[in-house]
Amino acid sequence: MAAPAQPQQKKTLLMTEGSIWKSILLFSVPLILGNLLQQLYNTADSIIVGNFLGSNALAAVGSSGSPIYLLIGFSQGVAVGAGVVVSQYLGAKDKKETHIAVHTSLAIAVILGLILTVGGIAVSRSLLVWMNTPEEVLGDAVTYMKLYFGGVLFSVVYNMAAGILNAAGNSRRSVLYLACASITNIILDLVLIAGLKMGVAGAAIATDISQLVSCVLSLRFLMKVDADYKVELSAIRPDQRMTSRIIRIGLPTGIQNMVISFSNVLVQSSVNSYGAAAMAGFAAYMKIDGFNILPVTSFSMAATTFVGQNYGAGNLKRVKNGMWVTLGMSVLYTLCTGTLLLAFQNPIMHLFTSDETVVAFGCSAMHYFCPFYFLLATLHGMAGAVRGTGRSVPPMVVLLISLCLFRVVWIQFVLPFFAGIEGVFILYPVSWALGAVLMALYAWKGSWMTYEHS
């Protein structure tokens, strides 16, 4: 029975011993590179759309993002819950429970993916009309959304598979598969949009195929790996007890994602009221925004995995120290990138379009966002650490108050006092500051680090 132990160690990064900062860095760097790579191909997608199809098409694809995330947010929350459960069982070295958790997670992903496919296609037009999408943008936006949801199953299953890999500390695989998906997406964008002139439909189809590639590659690895989290297709079924635990941990994050996405839909509706140029400028900047947001979420995931493994092993001192190390790395990253983006704002925005009105809207957003990303890093870093103990309700409450309720109140009662779109932009850093303060007040209490297996 001792023989399989060596391959297991090679395929699983256990962060329950050794240098804390090295463990977190070894896990985080591949994850950050993968997310940056993913954002790079998303940005390339928008650059190709903006340059070959024009600002209206760029606005259509960009404005579809908020309603898409509104619908898929719950599945992403469940994937977080599954990752927490798997990481805790791996930390506790419980092979049987790890096996059950992995296969239940994938079964849940398939079910959610099928539901989202049908539901997303059905409500696409109604949702975009409700968001006050301008008529000149609506047709392309509906086309993009419907085609995107045609392949959303691949995205949901990949996210769950990546969550399992990350829970095992094997984030390098996520980078590899994202690289393959990124290259596929960019090539297909050029072929379908620039070559075959398929318009925004080509952009959506390219995204679907790239997600299929990452899904197949990740599942193939999980089926071949010699580790406790190896996948057997015949064993993929929902275990009632494990489903209950995954949903219990993932439900708050899922609800949080959906409600926050709903607030972003309201924000997007406000942007839409300023016209197609504002929509295009905001859409272009939000692609740049991802180069800050995704690494922040990567560090948050690192905190969740590190805390999950050490909490499962009962190493509470490492839990606390790991949170602070991860938080410091995340804040430092955002300070550096925010400064660089501000320094090169004009040439960056001109990559997307030559329309000076669109560029002006994008640069305006950059002025309000970039200096304050460290607040978002603080919020998500602490939330990720707390979530790693299985206590996902407190982060949910904080994020719902700051990133949803506060934004809704702002849009309804504060935004009318602003003459221009700046009132929408300033909403973001103010809500980040509120969330960071509330999360810090909870995290510093320390009660979430009490050791208890649920």
Sequence positions of predicted segments:
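Transmembrane alpha-helix boundary and packing residues in multipass membrane permease domains
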Residues: 31, 35, 47, 51, ...
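Helix-terminus/linker motif at the lipid-water interface of multi-pass membrane proteins
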Residues: 36, 40-59, 128-135, 191-198, ...
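Small-residue hotspots at the loop-to-helix junctions and early N-terminal turns
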Residues: 55-66, 145, 204, 276-291, ...
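Transmembrane helical elements of multi-pass membrane transporters/channels
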Residues: 26-45, 147, 181, 210-214, ...
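Short alpha-helical transmembrane segments in multi-pass integral membrane proteins
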Residues: 1-28, 86-151, 195-251, 307-372, ...
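N-terminal transmembrane alpha-helices
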Residues: 15-52, 66-81, 85, 110-117, ...
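Short runs within selected transmembrane alpha-helices of multi-pass transporters and secretion channels
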Residues: 79, 148-166, 174-182, 203-216, ...
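Small-residue-rich hydrophobic transmembrane alpha-helices
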Residues: 58-118, 155-174, 268, 281-345, ...
